[in-house]
Structure formats: structure tokens, C-alpha cells
Swiss-Prot record:
GO terms for molecular function: ATP binding; DNA binding; DNA negative supercoiling activity; metal ion binding. This is DNA gyrase subunit B. Few gyrases are as efficient as E.coli at forming negative supercoils. Not all organisms have 2 type II topoisomerases; in organisms with a single type II topoisomerase this enzyme also has to decatenate newly replicated chromosomes. It catalyses: ATP-dependent breakage, passage and rejoining of double-stranded DNA. InterPro entries: DNA_gyrase_B_C, GyrB, HATPase_C_sf, Ribosomal_Su5_D2-typ_SF, Ribsml_uS5_D2-typ_fold_subgr, Topo_IIA, Topo_IIA-like_dom_sf, Topo_IIA_B. It comes from the Bacteria.
Length: 643
């Protein structure tokens, strides 16, 4: 702990007077989901982020440079920073030490008065007190004023008054807590990779801060430390690592206006997909918002203006749409705001209207100057946009074919689609089934009220290597777009989704895995909001059927099969049938094993790490063979090959 703490420095009048109290903490244990989203694995990890966010705030204020997160034995978490240390003097309104108020009163903290912190990262803004309320045990150690202060809590209740336990020449705060099993009934075990990915993201978004993660649960301690002086510029470098950049360095801007801090990094590559990540106060704004709007608006306007004045765009027909200017773009937009307003289904859309104009103005001034100072790069970017524009015009006719006016519009549906009778998207499912024969079985075995079937013939186009015009000329892709009802590209609208479960159902062999990967690549590159909303699933058809007398067992993998063999009596003799494809199962078997909501097992496709997802699709489906070969060699030991 001591290593992460800072030598005594100026605490800048950060004291109890800056800690404001808004309301009590009684409801937190009764309704934890209101405060941390859920009590699932995701909610468990959210506890860590609430504490880490406070340390990030201290770093953004200029008082901390190192944050350490440790998963201790028995899944205790310890978060230490080398900031000023939480104030320990008496908070006037409550008559208790400020650190105790922060840890026991909801919405008490330096972020609410405006005088303590300029920016607060926490999505819910509830912080330490909620973590305390939802922890079986929590301990705080404050190094401040040359003294170490300590207090312990159980389920949010102080066990003794704040006490002095020693002298120190450091400053900082360490909080240890253990999540309460009464609240987190699903699991209290932390996933190292989940913590690692978010910590790496936070290090990119807060340049210069070092964040270390340690796992002490096993004998061999695992440790990763992240520190990026380049910040989001380094982020873009990593995202484009497996791509072919069109210019050497990412274009970078970091400026403030009207107390809004704007940081943008972008670089074009030779590909066709757009990878635009936006953040507000370190929160990934999956649904976009005003900062994204301002960036897109400025990008389109500046490129058209520059292209026209430089005589690269010579005709009106070559004017660029927003979609054209973003082809092959990798960009990260990050803003910091003293009072962010979040909206949208998942509270991940920035709503502050003033941000749009600030981002637009700061970015357009910088970007325009860059283009005129680097005309060769400007020409490459504009010419790429013109090519995209011509491809878009070529795709227009094909796009019209995919339009479905509404969920009730059946006249435009693909002929092969066996639609469901329900018009309620929340209960409707569509199964994308490999092959016509399997499609026939699934049509016979489904619940026709809520389950639609769309058979796919053969492998769809690899969209990683294709422009939108070519993609829209692919029959299987066109049928999917029409069936889903959302549109594609710039016209994509998730509110028009006809089904809230889109289920990929392929054979359990290598071809099936390839088709599954092609479909996931398409969803990730052109319909990513479907994944982000949790609408995309992978069916789990059985690989084996084991029969013993009149008893049948369906088994989904080799490990389950081995376990079942050991558990069953050798008599009566049993037989094993291996399903090579969905077409080998009759309608009743498909319903019983794979489609019946009462018994089926499905995997929900989730996007937790934009960097890993982007690099994985680029590696598996892109042009660089060497990277793919290396991946196969590294992972061959885990593969279940089917010859």
C-alpha cells in the first residue's frame, strides 16, 4: 500500500467543508439494482469502478499519479491511490469525520459541490457509500497530515470511530472491501480479464496516470500495469495495429472551452469499416450523444469544404455524406464535463446540448488547419471519401430492396423467411439457420407465434474485405437486413428492430464455426448496436445423443460426454450418435434441444472490450495472413477439429 501513496504535498484546501451531504443511504441494500445496475457479475465489478473512479478524479484534479487495484485472497478488493487522502476533519452538517460521511451517506462527496472536483467519472455518481452499503466488510486507511487514519464497517455500519494508527510521510487513500454474498447471490468472484480490460481503457483515457492491477488469489501473483503518455492517441495506434494506416500519425487535439475538455484522436486506414468510440467522463457512451454529433458534423463539413477549395471535389455529385467521410476511420472522442447528463436506454448517451457546439468548433478549427498543413494526407482522405460516395450511390438501389417499412409490413419480406405471427419485438425471435434442410426442420419444430426462421444458403460474404455496395449485393445479407427491419449504415435505427433475439444457429463443425464468424463480423461491422443492446445470440445445438435403453441424453461438448460416460452405469449398454449437422435432427429434436425456451441453452454475444473485438475480427477476417496463422498456431491446442 505504501508504495502507491504519495509524499506529503499540498492538499489545496480539500477539507470537510467541500464535502456536501444530499441524502441518506437506507434504500441501497433494499434496492441495489437502482444504484449499481444489477447484482449480477456486472454489478459486482461495478463496485470496483465506483472506488477507482474516485481515485481517477483525484488524479484528474492533479493530485494522484498512481492507482493500484488488488484482488486479494478470498476476493477482497483493495484500491490504493497516492492522492491527498480523503479529508478526516469534522463535516459541519453531520458532526462526523468527512471520510465517514463519504462512506456512509449517499451522495456525499467532493464531486457534488463543484469546489472539490471539476469532473466526476461515476455513471451513477453514488460512489463509496453504495460500495460500503453493499459490502460485507469495508476498511479505509487514509494517509494525511502525517498520520494514518483507519475505520472499519460492516454492511455500511461503522464498527468504531475513526482512529489514528500510526505516522506516515505519504499521502493517499486505500479502501479494502468484500462484496456481500447476501446481495450478490450469483457470484462474488472477480474476473481478472474484466477488470484488466477496463483498467487499460481508463489508462488510455487519462494520459499519464499509471494504473496497476494485481491478482493475489493464486500462489503466482499476476500483474499488469498500464501507463500511456499518448493517451487516446496511443488508443488509436492500438486499434489500427493490424490495419494499413493512410497517414503515419493519428491526428490529435486536446483543448478546453467553456469548462468542457475535449480530446480527439483519429486516423484513417485502407479498410471500409468505421470504428468510432466516444466517452464522456471516462464512461463509454455506446449510444453516442452530443459529443459524437459535434464530431461527425465537423468532420463532414471540413472535408467537403477542404475538398472543394482544393479542387479535389469537382462536382456536386461527389460531395461527401457523413457516411462517406467515416469510411476507414478509427477515432476516439473523449470529453470531460462538470455536469454530464446521460440519457438513452442504458444511460450511455450524452445529452448536454452545449457540448455539440464546443466539440464542433474545437475539432473543426484543428482539423482544417491540419489538412491545409498536410495536403498529401488531405488528398488521400478526401479521395477515399469520394470512392465511398460512388460506392454508396451504387448501393442505393440494393439498399432500397432491403427496406422494410415497419414491423407490420410483410409485403417486402424475403421469400425464404418463415415469420412469426407476433408483432411484439420484445417476445419475437429470429433464427438464422445454416442450410435449407435444417431450415425445413426448424420451421416444422418452432413456436410459430414468437419464432421466425430464415435459412441461409452457404457462407455469407466476408464483410471485413468489402464495401457497402458489394455487401448489399449479397443475397443472404440483403435478406437478413430486410427481415431485421433496422436498415443499415447511416440509416440504421435500432428502434425499428423486428426481433429482440437474433439467434445464429449453425452446425457444430468447422464450416458452422466459419459461418458463425462471418455473421458475427457482419453484425460487429455494420449492425454493432444490435450486439450492444444484447439482441444477438448463438444457439447451442447438441453435438451428441447418448441412448441407454429408453433414456436419451443430449450432450453439447466432449467434456460433458466424458463426464456423462463416467456417471452412467455400463448396463444396459448405451450407444452414442454424433450430429454432424442440424439437418440430421428431426423437428421434435431441434425443438427439444435447441429452440424450446424452457430447456435450451444460448450464448448472448456481448461487447466488453472494443480493442480486443476489433483486433480479433481484423485478424480472423482481414488481409494479413501472418497474424491469422500466428493465432491458429497459438490456439490450435484448444481447437476441436472436425475432419
Amino acid at each position: 500500500m505504501v508504495n502507491t501513496l504519495s509524499d506529503v504535498n499540498n492538499t489545496d484546501n480539500y477539507g470537510a467543508g467541500q464535502i456536501q451531504v444530499l441524502e441518506g443511504l437506507e434504500a441501497v441494500r433494499k434496492r441495489p439494482g437502482m444504484y449499481i445496475g444489477s447484482t449480477s457479475e456486472r454489478g459486482l465489478h461495478h463496485l470496483v469502478w465506483e472506488i477507482v473512479d474516485n481515485s481517477i478524479d483525484e488524479a484528474l484534479a492533479g493530485y494522484a499519479s498512481h492507482i493500484e487495484v488488488v484482488i486479494e485472497k478470498d476476493n477482497w478488493i483493495k484500491v490504493t491511490d497516492n492522492g491527498r487522502g480523503i479529508p478526516v476533519d469534522i463535516q459541519e452538517k453531520m458532526g462526523r469525520p468527512a471520510v465517514e460521511v463519504i462512506l456512509t451517506v449517499l451522495h456525499a462527496g467532493g464531486k457534488f459541490g463543484g469546489g472539490g472536483y471539476k469532473v466526476s467519472g461515476g455513471l451513477h455518481g453514488v460512489g463509496s457509500s453504495v460500495v460500503n452499503a453493499l459490502s460485507q466488510d469495508l476498511e479505509v486507511y487514509v494517509h494525511r497530515n502525517g498520520t494514518i487514519y483507519h475505520q472499519a464497517y460492516k454492511q455500511g455500519v461503522p464498527q468504531f470511530d475513526l482512529k489514528e494508527i500510526g505516522d506516515t510521510d505519504k499521502t493517499g487513500t486505500a479502501i479494502r472491501f468484500k462484496a456481500d454474498k447476501e446481495i450478490f447471490t450469483e457470484t462474488t468472484v472477480y474476473n481478472y480479464e474484466t477488470l484488466q480490460k477496463r483498467i487499460r481503457e481508463l489508462a488510455f483515457l487519462n494520459k499519464g496516470i499509471q494504473i496497476t492491477l494485481k491478482d493475489e488469489r493464486e500462489e503466482e501473483v499476476r500483474e499488469d500495469s498500464y501507463h500511456y503518455e499518448g493517451g487516446i492517441k496511443s488508443y488509436v495506434d492500438l486499434l489500427n495495429e493490424n490495419k494499413e494506416p493512410l497517414h503515419d500519425e493519428p491526428i490529435y487535439i486536446h483543448q478546453s472551452k467553456d469548462d468542457i475538455e475535449v480530446e480527439i484522436a483519429l486516423q484513417y486506414n485502407s479498410g471500409y469499416a468505421t470504428n468510432l468510440l466516444t466517452y464522456a467522463n471516462n464512461i463509454h457512451t455506446y449510444e453516442g450523444g452530443t459529443h459524437e454529433d459535434g464530431f461527425k458534423r465537423a468532420l463532414t463539413r471540413v472535408l467537403n469544404s477542404y475538398g472543394t477549395q482544393s479542387k479535389i471535389i469537382k462536382e456536386d455529385k461527389d460531395r461527401l455524406s457523413g457516411e462517406d467521410t467515416r469510411e476507414g476511420l478509427t477515432a476516439v472522442v473523449s470529453i470531460k464535463h462538470g455536469d454530464p447528463q446521460f440519457e438513452g436506454q442504458t444511460k450511455t448517451k450524452l445529452g448536454n446540448s452545449e457540448v455539440r457546439q464546443v466539440v464542433d468548433r474545437l475539432f473543426s478549427e484543428h482539423f482544417e488547419r491540419f489538412l491545409y498543413e498536410n495536403p498529401s494526407v488531405g488528398r488521400i482522405i478526401v479521395e477515399k471519401g469520394i470512392m465511398a460516395s460512388r460506392a454508396r450511390v451504387a448501393a442505393k438501389k440494393a439498399r432500397e430492396v432491403t427496406r422494410r417499412k415497419s414491423a407490420l409490413d410483410v409485403s417486402s419480406l424475403p421469400g425464404k423467411l418463415a415469420d412469426c405471427s407476433s408483432k411484439n419485438p420484445e417476445e419475437s425471435e429470429i433464427f438464422l439457420v445454416e442450410g435449407d434442410s435444417a431450415g425445413g426442420s426448424t420451421k416444422s419444430g418452432r413456436d410459430s407465434r414468437t419464432q421466425a426462421i430464415l435459412p441461409l444458403r452457404g457462407k455469407i460474404l466476408n464483410v471485413e474485405k468489402a464495401r457497402l455496395d458489394r455487401i448489399l449485393n449479397n443475397n443472404e445479407i440483403r435478406q437478413m437486413i430486410t427481415a431485421f427491419g433496422t436498415g443499415i449504415g447511416g440509416e440504421f435505427d435500432i428502434s425499428k428492430a423486428r426481433y429482440h433475439k437474433i439467434v445464429i444457429m449453425t452446425d457444430a463443425d468447422v464450416d458452422g464455426a466459419h459461418i458463425r464468424t462471418l455473421l458475427l463480423t457482419f453484425f460487429y461491422r455494420f449492425m454493432r448496436p444490435l450486439i450492444e443492446a444484447g439482441y444477438v445470440y448463438i444457439a447451442q445445438p447438441p453435438l451428441y445423443k447418448l441412448t441407454q435403453g429408453k433414456q436419451k441424453y443430449y450432450v453439447f461438448n466432449d467434456r460433458e460426454l466424458d463426464k456423462l460416460k463416467q456417471e452412467l452405469n455400463p448396463s444396459p449398454k448405451w450407444s452414442i450418435a454424433r450430429y454432424k449437422g442440424l439437418g440430421e435432427m428431426n423437428a421434435d429434436q431441434l425443438w427439444e434441444t435447441t429452440m424450446n425456451p424452457e430447456h435450451r441453452s444460448m450464448l448472448q454475444v456481448r461487447l466488453e472490450d472494443a480493442i480486443d473485438a476489433d483486433q480479433t475480427f481484423e485478424m480472423l477476417m482481414g488481409d494479413v495472413v501472418e497474424n491469422r496463422r500466428q493465432f491458429i498456431e497459438d490456439n490450435a491446442v484448444y481447437a476441436n477439429l472436425d475432419f
